[in-house]
């Protein structure tokens, strides 16, 4: 989720705290992946989104599932109310506030790096 040159990052309650994550979740039966994005963002942060743009997918062996990466924009107020049983923290950060991301294969890290690089180099996300 992007808003005014910032990206929404989080730390999952039971996850790693050495790098940021993006909001994520699983599709429910009968739900499109676009509906999943909107629902998961709202459930975890109480934020609404618009202008969803598919980035790419990645097989995820840990849960035997397929990840779908989307960039989207905030639609409405930017006040974050986290789902405390899932998230330890969620906040808006500028590209300059994104600290070094460990070199790993996770799609979420690739997307955060792309946001940072594109915003610094071009002033906008290049998709």
Whereabouts are the PLM-identified features?
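N-terminal strand-loop-strand
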Residues: 1-22, 26-27, 48-49, 72-76
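An acidic- and aromatic-residue-enriched active-site/binding cleft used to recognize and process polar
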Residues: 12-13, 57-59
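Nudix hydrolase/Nudix homology domain
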Residues: 16-20, 84-127
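The catalytic Nudix box helix
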Residues: 22-55, 70
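A broad structural signal for short, well-ordered beta-strand segments within beta-sheet-rich domains
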Residues: 49, 66, 74, 86-89
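Hydrophobic/anchoring residues in structured secondary elements
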Residues: 54-57, 92
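Active-site-adjacent beta-strand/loop module that shapes the phosphate/pyrophosphate-binding cleft
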Residues: 58-81
């Amino acid at each position: 989720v992007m808003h005014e040159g910032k990206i929404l990052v989080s730390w999952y309650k039971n996850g790693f705290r050495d790098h940021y994550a993006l909001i994520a979740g699983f599709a429910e039966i009968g739900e499109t992946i676009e509906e999943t994005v909107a629902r998961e963002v709202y459930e975890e942060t109480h934020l609404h989104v618009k202008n969803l743009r598919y980035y790419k997918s990645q097989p995820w062996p840990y849960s035997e599932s397929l990840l779908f990466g989307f960039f989207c924009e905030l639609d409405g107020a930017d006040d974050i109310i986290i789902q405390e049983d899932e998230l330890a923290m969620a906040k808006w950060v500028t590209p300059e506030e994104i600290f070094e991301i460990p070199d790993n294969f996770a799609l979420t890290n690739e997307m955060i790096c792309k946001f940072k690089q594109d915003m610094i180099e071009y002033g906008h996300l290049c998709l």
